[in-house]
């Protein structure tokens, strides 16, 4: 992984775990990564990815040579060690299934401060590896800020460490595909009224679903 100017914008703590995540991926879950050229060269953006495994956040984040922000369920902060680590990598706590407006506001503020964020529109890990319906929150955050959204599809993470597995299946390849960024003009529908954020969320999720398996992908 070549050093880039964006690496210098990482805090030392985040940079260490970024490199550690990348190394673990290369050693035990290495598949292929496509589409990293689709990251906007300047300004904030959202990465919206499917979610089938605990492996998804570190693997997706390790492919981006800048400090990203993530969501995590608030209950993880109950552990002092986890709280210390999550705070140091600037993770945003969210109350699952409660429409946590405070967390959404923190994401919007981060984007307005030129920070980029990794989101999982489905809200939680898939129970079977298949895509789930997107929650409207991702649409709200995208529409409120107008930032480009980079769709991401992760293949193989459910087989590597899906819901219900006690230990990872080391050696099972995980492949990541980033699609072209979606401009606000293609996901936002201001005339949709109360359905505006739902429409945006479903359009973003449709772009994730449209990313084919790597052997067929054209990025």
Predicted regions: what they are:
Residues 2-13, 102-219:
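Non-catalytic C-terminal accessory region of glycerolipid acyltransferases
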Residues 26-34, 158-161:
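Short gly/ser/thr-rich secondary-structure transition/capping motifs
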Residues 30, 44, 173-175:
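A residue-level signal for beta-strand positions that form part of recognition/binding surfaces
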Residues 37-40, 169:
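A short beta-turn/loop motif at secondary-structure boundaries
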């Amino acid at each position: 992984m070549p050093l880039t100017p964006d690496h210098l914008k990482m805090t030392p703590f985040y940079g260490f775990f970024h490199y550690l995540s990348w190394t673990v991926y290369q050693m035990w879950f290495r598949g292929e990564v496509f589409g990293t050229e689709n990251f906007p060269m300047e300004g904030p953006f959202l990465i919206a990815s499917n979610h089938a495994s605990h492996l998804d956040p570190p693997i997706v984040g390790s492919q981006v040579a800048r400090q990203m922000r993530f969501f995590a369920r608030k209950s993880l902060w109950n552990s002092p060690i986890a709280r210390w680590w999550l705070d140091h990598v600037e993770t945003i706590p969210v109350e699952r299934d409660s429409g946590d407006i405070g967390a959404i506001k923190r994401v919007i503020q981060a984007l307005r401060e030129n920070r980029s964020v990794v989101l999982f529109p489905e809200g939680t890990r898939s129970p079977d590896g298949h895509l789930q319906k997107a929650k409207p929150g991702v649409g709200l955050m995208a529409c409120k800020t107008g930032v480009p959204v980079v769709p991401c599809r992760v293949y193989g993470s459910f087989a590597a460490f899906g819901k219900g597995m006690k230990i990872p299946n080391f050696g099972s390849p995980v492949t990541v595909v980033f699609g072209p960024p979606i401009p606000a003009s293609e996901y936002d529908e201001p005339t949709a009224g109360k359905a505006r954020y739902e429409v945006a969320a479903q359009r973003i999720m449709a772009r994730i679903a449209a990313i084919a398996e790597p052997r067929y992908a054209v990025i």
